[in-house]
């Protein structure tokens, strides 16, 4: 486990004093203090950042302001969110928030809800319409042109996702008319980073948000959101392929570069604004290929 804290000078001095008997030499020029407590290391950086790494990280960091994360124990009365499209050059970005109640638990298990990455696209296209029809949810679809506009306005790849997850949760809470017991986000950034960006947003959910890695494997609500988001992404990619006259691939590999280069040659570089996330490195690679 990794926990990162930003401590003041006095707090860093207190930490160094507390663990001076565990101090070891670090070859990293940016580390001012390094200690090994059992199997857990503590690294204090010149920037003021302190990294606790190991199985006792949470326990050691709790003495310096870290609040241990409480993982929800129930599957129901819970909102879960997930996004799809953030790693694909072509296509938009889809973020879904879904609410799972006790009455829908058996239904979800019967139709085989699982993380979308574990399901074939064919299975997703079978399941997703049933989920959309029955499960309370809010899905936000950001087309490439809108995505590029938002990025150009000052957002980055992380802050745009924070804004969308936050808004989807906020709108779903309003739709439900009551507070869920828990809200779980499939973690795509650190909790500190999430808080930094979400504090800049206008709307905020009433319920505390928990960020968990691999949450789609632990909570059905997150798995539902994963499936709906994946379905919407596939539909969006299909629509954009039809409009452009090119079969647009998912992902951000070499094939994306080659297809983008073909689009540039036939329609001009501006055509990519409607089809792809321009800040990806694929854009410049495609321009170079198109010039060959």
From Swiss-Prot:
Manganese or magnesium. Binds 1 divalent metal ion per monomer in the absence of substrate. May bind a second metal ion after substrate binding. A divalent metal cation binds at residues 82-83, 186. GO terms for biological process: DNA replication, removal of RNA primer; mismatch repair. Its EC number is 3.1.26.4. It is an enzyme of class 3 (hydrolase). InterPro entries: RNase_HII/HIII (IPR001352), RNase_HII/HIII_dom (IPR024567), RNase_HIII (IPR004641), RNase_HIII_N (IPR024568), RNaseH-like_sf (IPR012337), RNaseH_sf (IPR036397), TBP_dom_sf (IPR012295). One of its GO terms (molecular function) is magnesium ion binding. Its cofactor is Mn(2+); Mg(2+). Gene3D superfamilies: Ribonuclease H-like superfamily/Ribonuclease H, TATA-Binding Protein. Residues 76-292 form the RNase H type-2 domain. GO terms for cellular component: cytoplasm; ribonuclease H2 complex. Keywords: Cytoplasm, Endonuclease, Hydrolase, Magnesium, Metal-binding, Nuclease. It holds the Pfam family DUF3378. Endonuclease that specifically degrades the RNA of RNA-DNA hybrids. Belongs to the RNase HII family. RnhC subfamily. NCBIfam families: rnhC. This is Ribonuclease HIII.
């Amino acid at each position: 486990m990794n926990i990162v804290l930003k401590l003041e000078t006095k707090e860093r001095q207190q930490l160094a004093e507390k663990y001076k008997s565990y101090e070891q030499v670090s070859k990293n020029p940016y580390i001012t203090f390094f200690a090994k407590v059992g199997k857990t290391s503590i690294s204090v950086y010149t920037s003021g950042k302190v990294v606790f790494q190991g199985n006792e990280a949470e326990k050691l960091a709790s003495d310096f302001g870290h609040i241990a994360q409480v993982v929800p124990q129930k599957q129901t009365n819970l909102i879960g969110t997930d996004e799809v499209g953030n790693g694909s050059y072509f296509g938009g970005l889809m973020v879904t928030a879904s609410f799972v109640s006790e009455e829908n638990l058996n239904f979800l298990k019967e139709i085989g809800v699982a993380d979308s990455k574990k399901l074939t696209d064919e299975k997703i296209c079978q399941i997703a319409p049933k989920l959309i029809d029955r499960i309370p949810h809010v899905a936000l679809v950001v087309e490439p042109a809108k995505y590029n506009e938002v990025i150009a306005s000052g957002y980055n790849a992380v802050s745009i996702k924070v804004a969308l997850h936050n808004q989807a949760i906020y709108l779903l809470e309003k739709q439900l008319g009551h507070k869920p017991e828990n809200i779980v986000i499939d973690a795509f950034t650190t909790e500190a980073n999430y808080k930094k960006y979400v504090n800049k947003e206008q709307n905020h959910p009433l319920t505390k948000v928990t960020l968990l890695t691999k949450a789609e494997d632990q909570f059905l609500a997150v798995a539902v959101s994963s499936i709906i988001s994946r379905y919407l992404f596939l539909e969006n990619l299909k629509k954009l392929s039809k409009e452009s006259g090119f079969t647009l691939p998912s992902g951000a590999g070499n094939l994306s570069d080659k297809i983008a280069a073909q689009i540039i040659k036939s329609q001009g570089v501006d055509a990519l604004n409607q089809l792809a996330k321009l800040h990806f490195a694929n854009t410049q690679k495609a321009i170079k290929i198109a010039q060959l």
